[in-house]
């Protein structure tokens, strides 16, 4: 996925949010995270499990070959192998997330999205019409989190379609374009159900936050 947004990207997306919100009482907020976790401990668990299974295989082979190794030496070899694996895990950027199961990566990214929804007060708009568009780049994950009033009106499959287009664009190194499209589509859905009126206060900042 694309790794960062330029200052020009930020200005363009802020203008896109402002334009989308002129048609609706809804509020759109965007957060782009580099990652949602360091994943060292899940990856370390996977490595430990791998060392354990490899040790079983080696132990079985030694037993079949009648090759004698003392218990202490065998345990020390296991410990050395695990220590070396953990050092490599620390030293190689991006290795931890590759060793972490996809389901766990997505859960961590989703949890981060919910934290950002609350941290940026998207849930505190007057009419409960806030929407968070969230992307976590390392996990290749995106989601739309909608507040209660919107959730009652907009079907989940409509958000899913927006997310699918956003993820596809980000994977193709077109993150800015994908976010702009998601903002436009979200604004269109909000305008259908929560059209702007005479009183249309801007309750959330119109910009993209990178964390």
Locations of regions flagged by a protein language model:
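Cytosol-/stroma-facing membrane-proximal "stalk/adaptor" domains immediately downstream
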Residues: 161-211
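Select subsegments of transmembrane alpha-helices in polytopic membrane proteins
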Residues: 40-51
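Membrane-cytosol interface motif
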Residues: 102-120
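Transmembrane alpha-helices and immediately adjacent membrane-cytoplasm interface residues
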Residues: 59-98
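Flexible, solvent-exposed short loops/turns enriched in glycine
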Residues: 123, 139-174
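Alpha-helical transmembrane cores and adjacent cytosolic helix/loop segments
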Residues: 1-2, 6, 36-41, 66-69
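Soluble periplasmic/extracytoplasmic beta-strand elements of cell-envelope proteins
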Residues: 27-32, 130-136, 143-145
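Short, charged cytosolic
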Residues: 2-28
């Amino acid at each position: 996925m694309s790794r960062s947004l330029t200052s020009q990207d930020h200005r363009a997306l802020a203008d896109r949010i402002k334009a989308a919100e002129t048609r609706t009482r809804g509020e759109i907020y965007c957060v782009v995270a580099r990652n949602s976790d360091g994943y060292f401990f899940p990856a370390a668990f996977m490595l430990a499990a791998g060392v354990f299974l490899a040790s079983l295989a080696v132990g079985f082979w030694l037993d079949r070959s009648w090759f004698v190794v003392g218990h202490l030496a065998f345990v020390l070899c296991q410990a050395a192998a695990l220590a070396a694996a953990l050092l490599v895990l620390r030293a190689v950027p991006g290795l931890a997330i590759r060793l972490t199961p996809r389901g766990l990566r997505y859960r961590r990214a989703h949890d981060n999205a919910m934290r950002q929804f609350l941290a940026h007060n998207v849930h505190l708009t007057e009419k409960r019409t806030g929407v968070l568009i969230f992307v976590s780049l390392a996990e290749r994950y995106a989601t739309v989190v909608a507040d209660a009033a919107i959730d009652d009106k907009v079907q989940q499959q409509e958000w899913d379609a927006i997310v699918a287009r956003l993820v596809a664009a980000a994977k193709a190194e077109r993150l800015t374009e994908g976010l702009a499209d998601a903002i436009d589509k979200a604004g269109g859905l909000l305008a259908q159900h929560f059209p702007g009126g005479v009183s249309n206060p801007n309750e959330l900042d119109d910009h993209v936050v990178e964390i």
